[in-house]
Amino acid sequence: MLCLYELQVTDSQSNSTLDPMFDDIPAQSSNTPLLNRRAGDGVRSLVVRTVAGPIEYFSVGEGPAILGMHGTPGGFDQVALIGETVEARGFRIVGWSRPGYLGTPLDVGRTPAQQADAAAALLDSLGIDRVCVYGASGGGPATYSFAARHPDRTWAMVTECAISKRFGDDLAPLQKMLLRAAINGLTVPIFDWLANRFPDTLARQMIRVEGTLDRRSARALSSQVSADPAKAAFVTGLFQTLNPLSLRKAGLLNDLDQFERIERLPLDQVECPALVIHGTHDSDVRFEHGEFAARSIRGAEFVAVEGGTHLLWVAQQAAELQARRLKFLRRHAPI
């Protein structure tokens, strides 16, 4: 039986021990309940006690289970956003807030291996035997670690623009500046204002920052996104999964620290069917991460999205990519 309760955020989730320069971001009030948090689309999260510690999660749909590992920063709400269309096609989506994000304390698991084991503990508590593990962006290390460490529980793996090796040393100066500004809470009010007043401008800025497209190509993609209500809503929704930053700061800082410590992820130990998707013009997690993963995982299917940025869900080929994902999932899903 699940043990559900109201989780209170305490000072134990503060990041002052990690880096005092980030103490200007206020911690969330300790009397804020996290039970029944809702994502932007109304998905409700719960907190379950596991052998690894308390974990915030959501579960929707029926059918073969897909476990989502969100990016950096993120939370269960990011998995809910990405999993909407898949859930509607006969799959159960289970998303969680990785340690340090929202309602999952950082002590549940700091390293990719620890987070993989914590995810397995979550599945135990939910009575789920096997899953397809899906990881995007900063969720890559935990995703690859889960598939390698828990092969008997993984019927397939899908990664998208995912980190597959050491990350952080190759960031461009502009990216480092934007990342520092984001961590210090300087960009959130600006982008929040853009999301509410000028969503088209927000889409243009996110596409510009998340890709290496030339100006003409970036403008063309922005126009396509603005003209498509579903894609425009996705961009706005994705931004909303970055807030409130005060409840994601611990996970963000831990992720950045862990990514720089990566020596070698257990890619060559992944035995399940694997689909690796990456955009050729991804400026956040560079294309070489996808190439490296595809080379290292035996039998992996590799989809190189020409002109794709870090936001493949709004790429020109978005419909084709969705069809490819579903085809892969249906081919390998347990009967």
Roles of regions detected by a PLM:
Residues 178, 185-265:
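Alpha/beta-hydrolase
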Residues 270, 276-278, 282:
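Short beta-strand/loop motif that positions the catalytic acidic residue
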Residues 283-289:
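Conserved alpha/beta-hydrolase "acid-adjacent" motif
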Residues 114-131:
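Conserved acidic catalytic loop of the alpha/beta-hydrolase fold
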Residues 99-113:
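Glycine-rich "HGGG/HGxG" loop immediately N-terminal to the catalytic nucleophile
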Residues 58-103:
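Conserved HGGG/HGGXW glycine-rich cap/lid loop of the alpha/beta-hydrolase fold
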Residues 300-335:
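Catalytic active-site module of serine/aspartate enzymes centered on a nucleophile-bearing elbow/loop
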Residues 157-189:
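Flexible "cap/lid" loop of the alpha/beta hydrolase fold
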